[in-house]
Amino acid sequence: DNVTGVQTCALPIYKKKYKALVGEGSISGCKVILVKPHTYMNLSGDSLREVMDFYKEEFEHLLVIYDDIDIPTGSIRIRKNGSAGTHNGMRSIVRQLGTEEFPRIRIGIGRNSGDLADYVTGGFTKDEVKPLEEAVINAAYAVECMLDKGIDIAMSRYNMVYKLPKG
């Protein structure tokens, strides 16, 4: 949600289409379509498949941004491609598209020892909020950098590991 609100990537979401909320606009002079699936997470691929089919876009023009419990809170990992890992939404996307060959930005939300569903859908602690907000802002700048300078430069500038203070 928040990446679209960062000034560099401010795209209004104005349509309900393809089982998603959709916004269109421009970032760094490139036409961008933002798709926020409105399905259960494990069905995210259904929505994205419809969008890709309608716009007849190539997979290299796709960028998936998602939260990930498998990397530390506040960290960002940009990849050109790769497996879905443990993320059910990404598993759905890979299954529907039939490929892992598309770029993605993972925003780390870390993991806690409680119930996973409660953790992922619940709120974050006071110590987690600031690094997560910074990670979202950096992810937005990474999108702009990818469009301006390419994914390799974005990876070298924005792939980072954030360490929460021990407390």
Go through each PLM region and give its residues.
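Phosphate-binding/catalytic loops
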Residues: 74-86, 90-167
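N-terminal catalytic or cofactor-binding beta/alpha core of small enzyme domains
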Residues: 10-43
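Short secondary-structure boundary/capping segments
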Residues: 14, 24-25, 54, 94, ...
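Short acidic/glycine-rich loop or secondary-structure boundary segments that cap or lie
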Residues: 43-44, 71-74
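Single conserved hydrophobic/aromatic residue that forms the stacking wall/gate
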Residues: 1-9
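Catalytic-core elements of nucleic-acid end-processing and repair enzymes
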Residues: 67
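A short, glycine/Asx- and small/polar-enriched loop/turn
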Residues: 27-32, 72-73, 115-116
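Short phosphate-binding loop-to-helix
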Residues: 31-63, 83-86
